[in-house]
Amino acid sequence: MLEAWQIQEIIPHRYPFLLVDRIIEIEWGQRAVGIKNVTVNEPFFVGHFPGNPVMPGVLIIEALAQVGAVALLGHPQYRDKTAFFAGIDGVRFKRPVRPGDTLRLEVQIGKVRRNIGTGTGRATVDGELAAEGEILFALLDPEAARTTR
């Protein structure tokens, strides 16, 4: 299990954009399961939507991507890389995620060829599917990541 401070040693995300509270299962380079406890204090609930707070779907996908990045970048082969979103395919949202929900984020890493890879993600609340889809990512050396435009 990894706590937030350990996650931050692997990926660069920080508050308010770190969307994973802990990792509860991990097979380095292959898969991970993370948890996000969704609270009413999330900054995005201020405007999405007043009186009817719903976690934006794009942030659910970002949370899945962060879990996948932890699984991949924690593997010795990829520790010196930075992962970037390259695309999403077949994403479907099945239920809203609201304050008080515990989001379970499961990611299976697929093929990685050269510096491009895929992962399949599923987000659930109380066993009910909230979102799923395929994530595409690019792996770059940190210096290239800072200078790529």
Curated annotation (Swiss-Prot):
Listed GO CC annotations: cytoplasm; membrane
InterPro entries with a match to the protein in the record: FabA_FabZ, FabZ, HotDog_dom_sf
One Pfam family recorded for the sequence: FabA
GO molecular function: (3R)-hydroxyacyl-[acyl-carrier-protein] dehydratase activity
Localization of this protein: Cytoplasm
UniProt main location, coarse: cytoplasm
UniProt function note: Involved in unsaturated fatty acids biosynthesis. Catalyzes the dehydration of short chain beta-hydroxyacyl-ACPs and long chain saturated and unsaturated beta-hydroxyacyl-ACPs.
Protein name as catalogued: 3-hydroxyacyl-[acyl-carrier-protein] dehydratase FabZ
Gene: fabZ
